[in-house]
């Protein structure tokens, strides 16, 4: 159990300190796409929520 906890701590520590990866700047040629790139990580969550809505709608039939 302590090994799993230490592994989680190491992963969180590395994820928090590599924030330069998450906030990298796009090259000037692609600066127009900044708003789209900011929203892109949220798109899979919409599909995840859609699955629950679909199941709820199907169960009410």
Swiss-Prot record:
Keywords: Chloroplast, Membrane, Photosynthesis, Photosystem II, Plastid, Reaction center, Thylakoid, Transmembrane, Transmembrane helix. The chain crosses the membrane at residues 36-56. Residues 1-24 form a propeptide. The keyword Oxidoreductase does not apply. It comes from the Eukaryota. Belongs to the PsbK family. PSII is composed of 1 copy each of membrane proteins PsbA, PsbB, PsbC, PsbD, PsbE, PsbF, PsbH, PsbI, PsbJ, PsbK, PsbL, PsbM, PsbT, PsbX, PsbY, PsbZ, Psb30/Ycf12, at least 3 peripheral proteins of the oxygen-evolving complex and a large number of cofactors. It forms dimeric complexes. This is Photosystem II reaction center protein K. It comes from Amborella trichopoda.
């Amino acid at each position: 159990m302590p090994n799993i906890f230490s592994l989680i701590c190491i992963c969180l520590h590395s994820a928090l300190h590599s924030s330069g990866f998450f906030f990298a700047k796009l090259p000037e040629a692609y600066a127009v796409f900044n708003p789209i790139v900011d929203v892109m990580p949220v798109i899979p969550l919409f599909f995840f929520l859609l699955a629950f809505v679909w199941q709820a709608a199907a169960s009410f039939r």
